[in-house]
């Protein structure tokens, strides 16, 4: 990770205040983390190269920011079950700066909701992220305002944020992760 120790949650900090090797290295390990810890990990992660995300990545929804209590727990439990329909994302870089992608749903049978990829400033802070923009005419109207972004936690593991872009502001609605 390329950040100061202050950006790393205390649960992943060594006793001397330096980053430890306990930064999660799997989708399952990320599922156990709360929203504040995910936010700190995201801020401290790296900007991925488009070439590194090429191909099919397994996905996992981690946590929602718009629900609390039992509702949030129920959503997390469903997201970690085999019944959850989202399987991941597939990335097809065009060059080092831009690319395309699509979501894989229901046992990878359906490829839905195309997005364009590019590196730009994150909505979460003063750093860059790989942006996933769903605003294209092939997507249904309710998908077009979604703006995802991802950062690399470790080789082969990416942490993402999903935003809903409304006329006046973008609102963070959930965290997700992708893995090779």
Give names to the regions the model predicted.
Residues 2-180:
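Soluble ligand-binding/transfer domains with enclosed cavities or grooves
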């Amino acid at each position: 990770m390329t950040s100061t120790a202050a950006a790393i949650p205390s649960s992943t900090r060594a006793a001397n205040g330096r980053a430890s090797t306990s930064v999660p290295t799997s989708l399952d390990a990320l599922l156990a983390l709360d929203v504040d810890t995910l936010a700190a990990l995201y801020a401290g992660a790296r900007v991925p190269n488009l070439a590194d995300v090429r191909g099919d990545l397994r996905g996992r929804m981690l946590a929602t920011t718009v629900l609390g209590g039992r509702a949030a727990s129920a959503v997390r439990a469903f997201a970690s079950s085999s019944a959850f329909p989202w399987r991941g994302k597939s990335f097809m870089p065009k060059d080092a700066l831009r690319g395309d992608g699509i979501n894989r749903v229901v046992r990878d049978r359906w490829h839905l909701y195309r997005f364009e990829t590019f590196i730009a400033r994150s909505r979460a802070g003063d750093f860059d992220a790989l942006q996933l923009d769903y605003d294209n005419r092939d997507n249904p109207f309710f998908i077009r305002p979604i703006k995802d972004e991802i950062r690399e936690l470790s080789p082969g593991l990416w942490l993402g944020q999903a935003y809903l872009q409304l006329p006046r502001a973008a609102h963070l609605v959930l965290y997700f992760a992708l893995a090779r």
